[in-house]
C-alpha cells in the first residue's frame, strides 16, 4: 500500500557543548570547541637556605612547588592555524545555533510491503446463482517510514576569547603544551657527546610556548545563514488496520470470480519521531543535538477493495486486486529544551495492491 504522507516543521537550538566560563579570572580551566586553556602547571624545585634541593621523605625525590603566578600558563592546546589570524594572539571559540527556519517540508514515501489476513462468511445468493454476498473481517500490518535531511536557516553565535602569546609563535595546529623536544648533547665546541656505546647522547628540552592565563578580550558575534546547520527528520513505526464489511462476489466462470467489498476500518498506529540537528562550525568537529518522542493513535476510517480470484481447487485459489483505505491523520511532536518540532502523519486516501492465497473451509 502507498506510504503515509508526512510533513516536518518546527524550530530548535543547538547549545554549545563547552563552557568557556567568565571572561575574567586567572588560572581557570576554560574549555572551547577548538581547544582549552588550563591552570599553569609549571613548578620549581624547593630549596633549603643554602640553595640545595629539599628531598621529600615519603618519595625520596626532590620536592617541587608551583611557581609564583606570572600571568602565563604552559598548559593549553589549540586545533587550527586559523586561530592565529590576529597576530600575537590565539583565538578560542565556542559555537551555538538557533534554528529559525519555519518552512514546512513534505515527504511522500514510496509504497511499502505489508501483511494482510481476512476471513469471510457466506451469507447467501443475490440475483440468482452468480452473485453471492459475504461478511468479511480482516487485519493488515504496514510499515511507517519517512526520512528527510535538509540544510535549515539558523542564527549562529560565536563566542571568541583571545589569549596573548607574549611575542612567541606556536607550532602549527594541532598543538598541545607543555611540549618537549629531544636534542643532542654537545661539548663546548659544538660536537656531539658520545656514550660508551658510541651512540650520541640526547637530552629532553622543554619547548612549551607560554600563553596568557586569562583572556585578553572576548568578542561575541552572530550571523544568519542557510548552510551551517542541517536537520534530519526520521519517522519510524507501523500501523494495524482492522476492517469489516460486506463483500459481493460475482462468478465469471467456474474458476474466475470478481469481488467488491466496502466497510468500516480502525487504524492503530505507533511511531517514533527523531530529529537530529547538526551544526558544522568553521573549525572543529560537528555539534549535534538529537531529540525523539513516541506516539500511539487510534483512528477511525473506511475501506474499499476489488479483486479477481482464480480457484485452483474447490478449497484453494489465488487472488489479486486493489485496495483503498482512509483513516485521517495525526500530529506527533518532539518538545524538549532544544527541539520544538512536529510531524503530521497522514493516513488518508491510501491505495495499493494486494495479492495472496485463499483457502475455503
Task: Identify the role of each PLM range.
Residues 8-12, 83-110, 144-239, 268-299, ...:
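Extracellular/periplasm-exposed beta-strand and loop segments of Gram-negative cell-envelope proteins
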Residues 109, 120-135, 146-148, 251-258, ...:
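Short loop/turn motifs that connect adjacent beta-strands in outer-membrane beta-barrel proteins
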Residues 115-121, 137-139, 242-250, 262-266, ...:
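Residues on the lipid-exposed face of transmembrane beta-strands in outer-membrane beta-barrel proteins
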Residues 3-5, 139-145, 264-272, 324-328, ...:
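Transmembrane beta-strands of outer-membrane beta-barrel pores
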Residues 1-121, 350, 358-360:
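Short glycine/proline- and aromatic-enriched beta-strand/turn motifs that initiate or cap beta-hairpins
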Residues 233, 238-265, 269-270, 304-305, ...:
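Alpha-helical scaffolds that organize eukaryotic protein assemblies
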Residues 110-116, 132, 237-243, 257-259, ...:
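Transmembrane beta-barrel architecture of outer-membrane proteins
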Residues 310-319, 328-332:
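Substrate-binding/catalytic groove segments of enzymes
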Amino acid at each position: 500500500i502507498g506510504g503515509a504522507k508526512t510533513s516536518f516543521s518546527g524550530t530548535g537550538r543547538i547549545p554549545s557543548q563547552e563552557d568557556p566560563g567568565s571572561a575574567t579570572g586567572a588560572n581557570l580551566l576554560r574549555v572551547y570547541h577548538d581547544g582549552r586553556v588550563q591552570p599553569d602547571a609549571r613548578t620549581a624545585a624547593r630549596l633549603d637556605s643554602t640553595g640545595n634541593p629539599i628531598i621529600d621523605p615519603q618519595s625520596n625525590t626532590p620536592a617541587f612547588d608551583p611557581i609564583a603566578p606570572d600571568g602565563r600558563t604552559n598548559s593549553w592546546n589549540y586545533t587550527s592555524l586559523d586561530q592565529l589570524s590576529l597576530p600575537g594572539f590565539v583565538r578560542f571559540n565556542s559555537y551555538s545555533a538557533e534554528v529559525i527556519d519555519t518552512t514546512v517540508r513534505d515527504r511522500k514515501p514510496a509504497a511499502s510491503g505489508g501483511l494482510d489476513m481476512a476471513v469471510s462468511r457466506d451469507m447467501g445468493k443475490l440475483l440468482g446463482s452468480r452473485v453471492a454476498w459475504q461478511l468479511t473481517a480482516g487485519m493488515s500490518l504496514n510499515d511507517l517510514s519517512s526520512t528527510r535531511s535538509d540544510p535549515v536557516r539558523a542564527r549562529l553565535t560565536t563566542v571568541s576569547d583571545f589569549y596573548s602569546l607574549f611575542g612567541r609563535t606556536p607550532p602549527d595546529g594541532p598543538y598541545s603544551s607543555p611540549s618537549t623536544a629531544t636534542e643532542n648533547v654537545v661539548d663546548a665546541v659544538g660536537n656531539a657527546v658520545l656514550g660508551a656505546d658510541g651512540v650520541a647522547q640526547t637530552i629532553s628540552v622543554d619547548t612549551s610556548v607560554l600563553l596568557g592565563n586569562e583572556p585578553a578580550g572576548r568578542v561575541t558575534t552572530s550571523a544568519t545563514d542557510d548552510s551551517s546547520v542541517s536537520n534530519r527528520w526520521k519517522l519510524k513505526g507501523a500501523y494495524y488496520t482492522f476492517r469489516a464489511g460486506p463483500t459481493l462476489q460475482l462468478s465469471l466462470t467456474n474458476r474466475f470470480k470478481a469481488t467488491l467489498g466496502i466497510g468500516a476500518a480502525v487504524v492503530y498506529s505507533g511511531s517514533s519521531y527523531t530529529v537530529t540537528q547538526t551544526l558544522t562550525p568553521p573549525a572543529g568537529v560537528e555539534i549535534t543535538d538529537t531529540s525523539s518522542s513516541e506516539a500511539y493513535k487510534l483512528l477511525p476510517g473506511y475501506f474499499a477493495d476489488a479483486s479477481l480470484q482464480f480457484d485452483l481447487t474447490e478449497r484453494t485459489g489465488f487472488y489479486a486486486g486493489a485496495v483503498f483505505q482512509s483513516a485521517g491523520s495525526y500530529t506527533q511532536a518532539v518538545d524538549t529544551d532544544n527541539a520544538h518540532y512536529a510531524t503530521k502523519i497522514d493516513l488518508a486516501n491510501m491505495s495499493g495492491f494486494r495479492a495472496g492465497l485463499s483457502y475455503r473451509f
